[in-house]
């Protein structure tokens, strides 16, 4: 089964880590993660103030990144060298891994990177972003009483 994870990054800024006179790093991050061995279908959304939502067939989780996490994410986004980022990061030996289809919108220009999970995690510029998604994925669902 082929897995697909779609990341959409719209640049604007994280309030907790960007001063008013600085150029903002991003505006909103939206991620659609599907496939894998378990056939997952998860949607992520992270706003500039660090608020996040994760939705799946099991339910919805809402939360807040702490200031350090928001800063790490903002710095990771600002640190991507778009001139050196390959459009495709794929390892033909990788099977049944997540696939990432990432869209990065900066002003009027869109950058797209497709990658399998292994290759994306080994890319120093993308790895901090993927690790933040893993952190959000681990937030437990609240049990209704």
Segments and roles (model prediction):
Residues 22-63:
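N-terminal secretory signal peptides
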Residues 14-16, 42, 49, 57, ...:
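Short linear sequence elements within intrinsically disordered, low-complexity coil regions
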Residues 5-14:
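Sec-dependent N-terminal signal peptides
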Residues 2-3, 18-36, 68-69, 76-77, ...:
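Short, well-ordered, aromatic-rich surface patches in folded extracellular/luminal domains
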Residues 57-80:
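Acidic, aromatic-enriched beta-alpha/helix-loop junctions
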Residues 8, 38, 53, 72, ...:
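A broad, structure-centric signal for solvent-exposed, well-ordered loop/edge residues
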